[in-house]
Amino acid sequence: MQTRYGRRALTIWPLLLLAIAAEVAATSLLPQTNGFRKLKPTVAVACLYTVAFALLAQILKFTDIGIAYALWAGLGTASVAVIGVLFRNERFSWKHAIGLALVVTGVVTLNLQAGQ
């Protein structure tokens, strides 16, 4: 990942992965809120999204928003889709597979471009 401070890239990756994990966990918990009618899952979702955005804000001190957000959104989207299939019995077709492959390809391409 391209950074404004060289060596700090090593500290950005763990923060980015934590931000993605918090966002994925929050998104995965959303159905349990029952439209924000259940207090505990709603509070958990709000806290996890707060953590995700706070970490993203810290990451943006050291890297470009276009790269960081694309990686966050792409990897988060792919992760939520996989979690949906594995744990929520959601459908998965060849169209889903192609879409996820395109997302992953986009993330890899952005990463390669950022390294130049």
Curated annotation (Swiss-Prot):
GO molecular function: transmembrane transporter activity
Transmembrane segments: 10-30, 42-62, 67-87, 92-112
Coiled-coil parts of chain: none
Record keywords: Cell membrane, Membrane, Plasmid, Transmembrane, Transmembrane helix, Transport
Membrane topology: Multi-pass membrane protein
Induction remarks: Is transcribed only in the presence of nicotine under the control of the transcriptional activator PmfR. Forms part of an operon with nepB, folD, mabO and purU.
Pfam family of the protein (one): Multi_Drug_Res
Entry GO terms, CC: plasma membrane
Localization of this protein: Cell membrane
Primary location: membrane
Function noted in UniProt: Component of an efflux pump responsible for the transport of nicotine breakdown products, in particular methylamine, out of the cell. This pump apparently serves as a metabolic valve for nicotine catabolites and may protect the bacteria from the potentially toxic side effects of these compounds.
Entries under PANTHER family matching the protein: MULTIDRUG TRANSPORTER EMRE, SMR FAMILY PROTON-DEPENDENT DRUG EFFLUX TRANSPORTER SUGE
Subunit annotation: The efflux pump is composed of NepA and NepB.
Similarity field: Belongs to the drug/metabolite transporter (DMT) superfamily. Small multidrug resistance (SMR) (TC 2.A.7.1) family. NepA/NepB subfamily.
Name of this protein: Nicotine metabolites export pump subunit NepA
Native source species: Paenarthrobacter nicotinovorans
